[in-house]
């Protein structure tokens, strides 16, 4: 399913291998999209090729930014900004919980990992892409 909204194209899938992997494949195939969202990932990934457990009931998404004014030097800033924005958003829904950031890419609640963020980059057809994937396990 594709949804057209004010901020671009959002694709929702019931199951994917990995939203980041799907994003990379879509970029390489010159497909137009901004967000990929999945109910379940069969092969979710974290940093350093770690496995990210992605059970049904979580939120697994990837946002792609295409901006040739950005480069690899901006990745750490984008990582920090992504963590803060996601933690802030989670806090809006579950106010009162003790949410903490564990740099560079984890969000903890009550000492347990609630969310992981994986940022990747891709150069394709003379364009620079930043791929921001995150998984929120809510069960």
Pin down the residues of each PLM region.
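N-terminal lobe of the biotin/lipoate ligase/transferase fold
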Residues: 1-92
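A short coil-to-beta-strand element that immediately follows conserved catalytic motifs
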Residues: 34, 96-102
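Beta-strand scaffold of nucleotide-dependent catalytic cores
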Residues: 37, 116-118, 131-132
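Active-site glycine-centered loops adjacent to acidic/histidine catalytic or metal-binding residues
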Residues: 44, 106, 135
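Glycine- and Gly-Pro-enriched alpha-helical subdomains that act as flexible
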Residues: 102-103, 108-109, 113-114, 118
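Short, low-complexity Ser/Thr-rich regulatory SLiMs
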Residues: 121-123
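Short, acidic (Asp/Glu-rich) active-site segment that either coordinates a divalent metal cofactor
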Residues: 126-139
